[in-house]
Amino acid sequence: MKLLILSILLSLTACNKKEIEMEKPYIKPIEPQTTSNYLALGDSYTIGEGVLVTERWPVQLAAALTQEGIPVETPQIIARTGWTTDELLIAIEAAQIKDTFELVSLLIGVNNQYRGRSVEQFRADLILLINKALEFSGNDPNKVFMLSIPDWGATPFAEGRDRDKIAREIDAYNSVIWQETNSRNILFVDITRISREALTDQSLLAADRLHPSGSMYSQWVQELLPKLKLRLQKP
């Protein structure tokens, strides 16, 4: 009888051991985080005229997003000082871009205003540029964003000119940008207010006293970051 009880106990112990082994929790392996590619389209503000490469706002933005847990590659930049909307369109065609990007930015228009181009022509070109940006993003508006045009009238370069007129024209262009981005559910970020602070704080300007300094670009990035994170983290 004792042998029978001992045999049963040993059998139960063996079964319990097997159950314990089978019930080990599943630990999901950590998937490596992918790094997003980024295309920045624009003019002197995007190429960072007068500042170091590391101070360009697209480069600062990529670094800030990476620090926030959204890894972004060093941006591919198609931009040049002095470009208008039509010149940027020509450059984009010449670049023959084949890739799809996780992030596409657009900042353009100041040279249209400076050269006295019409708002209507700006709108026509802007629509083409926005369509290109959407195409590069795989037609995902959450991956595209546009900045407002800075007000160069707040810089010493505008001394002796009608600053109020420049501001009104910049505002008119920015109104068009807001309309065209808003209708497509594209993020629009107003940095014009920050650019106007240069009127009383010239540390926000590069040595040429026309273009933003790395410090101003940092402020742009801080304005962009929370809004862009919300877009990029959408399921």
Language-model features: locations:
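Sec-dependent signal peptide recognition
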Residues: M1-S7
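Generic short amphipathic/hydrophobic targeting helices enriched at N-termini
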Residues: L4, N16-K18
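Alpha-helical cap/lid subdomain in secreted, periplasmic
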Residues: P71, I90-P235
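Active-site-proximal substrate-binding core of FAD-dependent oxidoreductases
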Residues: E87
